[in-house]
């Protein structure tokens, strides 16, 4: 027997048996949890992928109607207004009448559910978010489909737990988190970002165990495979592939990150302010709420005719920007304009997310920054498109406070793996400056606001009599 083998045997003999058994027992993941995670991922992938196709179908149908039947007996501007107003009305009505928790992104609802503070009524959230999101996003409003897919994915996870009568709370928690990861993986064709989003952004709520992490990974991979089978394996955003930038330009990426760090804190404040202003305006009165939402949707129908860059989630706008054709001044004007339209749509409580609008804002300012830097520093080999990609990750990192997720998300969406170093520098710079200014992550703010409103509503309820 060799000296090495003798040492191994003596070392194992000195270790308490309960320590060895405990270590091995931690690695015994129940097969049932893995199977249910796979099922959650497949269903979340189907829901997320077909939700995307449904939104595209509504948008294309709206455009076809304007080009043909309706445009023949109504003025084009009036037809555009009425169609988008009706689509928005569907979204707002379904939310207000059947599932108020389906308003907005939905990600804070999943985080609240993981903490045991919010219920997941999947039987009403799934249809309301799906069809309400079709209406709101199809109207041309500045909303993303990524938040809704995360909420619907989480709802799928809870649905599977209920259907299979899962009683173990840790398993139910793992399937809820797995559904959220699968939803994001299907929305962006980004499995790594889906996994990291749950592990990093939801870290205050996520219960870290071998089982829960494996469940999240399996679900995200399964959902992404479903997406690729249906939509193909191309990246979500088609744009130029860049080589690694010169080291002399890295300081500019850090400066861009600092600017986004400041803006991210301001942007988060404006989002919650917009939500509070809308609530004060409609006071949860259904008629006023629906009229306000319909008018907003109709206005975006008009904008689609004249300034389409200010409408929609923004994913289709990103490659248009990076292909050139816009000056820095126009890009900055669009940046300011889309800030306003994003706040208007998301603050109104429509069933839609903010991921895609944030990425579009990051692209607009980042590309404008790159164009300006190219003029001011002609001796440097500057590609403005690199700063657009870095801007996407930086704004995400500054607002969501999940830099690793933002980096992976942008890389997977654009296939620009050579830009990982500038993305890290820009994103970390954005997070550090945002923290120095004392800002809080956007989804934490939104969850806190939801829980505060829930507590106020409970206090307003009349006390029940002992005999009731």
Swiss-Prot record:
Site label Mediates proton transfer from the outer aqueous phase to the interior of the protein, positions: 146
Motif Selectivity filter part_3, residue range(s) on this chain: 353-357
GO CC aspect terms: plasma membrane
Organism superkingdom: Bacteria
Transmembrane annotation, as ranges: 31-67, 75-98, 122-139, 146-164, 213-230, 251-279, 286-307, 328-347, 353-374, 420-436
Chief localisation class: membrane
Motif Selectivity filter part_2: positions: 144-148
Cell membrane as UniProt keyword: yes
Intramembrane feature ranges: 107-114, 175-187, 191-199, 385-399, 400-402, 403-414, 415-419
Family statement drawn from the similarity comment of this UniProt entry: Belongs to the chloride channel (TC 2.A.49) family. ClcA subfamily.
Stated name of the protein: H(+)/Cl(-) exchange transporter ClcA
Organism: Vibrio cholerae serotype O1 (strain ATCC 39541 / Classical Ogawa 395 / O395)
Gene: clcA
